[in-house]
Amino acid sequence: MIVGVRGVLVSKEPSFVHVDVGGVVYEVFISLQSFSALSGNEVKLFTSHVIREDAQLLYGFLELGEKKLFERLIKINGVGPKVAMAICSTYTPSQFAVVLNNKDITAVQRVPGIGPKSAGRILVELSGFDTELIISASEPKSLAVAQASEALESLGFKKDKISKALGSCSAVDTAILVKEALKLLQTI
């Protein structure tokens, strides 16, 4: 299972990108949200690897929350990767969480390819879905803090000291957060 790709952006279209990873070029389907946020030559995408009888497809996302939303959507009967990607293209994970919390069937129907029956099914199937999960995973700072906290715990630091140190750090990148927190933890 391929869960992520990092490499050089070879080409970029609204629905897919080609990413060169160590000499192998992968075609990765992306949402319009990810397409508009892509910049630069180097790209890192969280991916969902969908294996069908006739194809193996990669769907890529800049945000972990968008990937979690996509993977939850394709588990719904009648919602395939194309419809799930259309939802991810229409709404950010936090916007879709609001739609779910409000049970807004007309907002779901605004997505191309979704009629009233499918919209109702999506709202029913996702009624117990933890929208906080996709919102928190979409915020890079909170994701980086969680990863940094995990790394520091594996080094043997106590959770309360880790929380205190990370609370004083301002970085958004996991590696920089760990470095800053380590400096602070040495003084505590």
Curated annotation (Swiss-Prot):
Write out the domain note.
Has three domains with a flexible linker between the domains II and III and assumes an 'L' shape. Domain III is highly mobile and contacts RuvB.
UniProt organism field: Sulfurimonas denitrificans (strain ATCC 33889 / DSM 1251)
Protein name, per record: Holliday junction branch migration complex subunit RuvA
Q: Gene name?
A: ruvA
Region (Domain I) residue ranges read 1-62
> Source organism's superkingdom?
Bacteria
One Pfam family name from the record? Answer: RuvA_N
Q: Tell me the segments the record calls region Domain II.
A: 63-135
User: One cellular component GO annotation, for this chain's record?
Assistant: cytoplasm
Q: What is its main location?
A: cytoplasm
